């Protein structure tokens, strides 16, 4: 139940952050958070990366093919990181590598998403 509450907060935070952002991106924060929902436990607790989490990371990476999409995904991730006070920032930053995915920016609470190409 606590995980569902955290996920709901994550989705709401992403929607609030992404709402006023004008962009040509096809990705929504709902899509981003939906793909990464299985990662919440890993990012806030100890334990291995769930297979479903890595599937979501890979899927999201495959969807974010254009610069606007990558920037939007970045904004959603930064918003989510800031909305989850219990997030382990080191785990968040290392999540793509842990899943064997290479993204062109570091996931953190302070990433400048406008510089993502």
Curated annotation (Swiss-Prot):
Keywords: Disulfide bond, Lipid-binding, Signal, Transport. It comes from the Eukaryota. Belongs to the plant LTP family. The keyword Transmembrane helix does not apply. InterPro entries: Bifun_inhib/LTP/seed_sf (IPR036312), Bifunc_inhib/LTP/seed_store (IPR016140), Plant_nsLTP (IPR000528). GO terms for molecular function: lipid binding. PANTHER family: NON-SPECIFIC LIPID-TRANSFER PROTEIN 2-RELATED. It comes from Brassica napus (Rape). Disulfide bonds join 29-76, 39-53, 54-99, 74-113. Residues 1-25 form the signal peptide. This is Non-specific lipid-transfer protein 3.
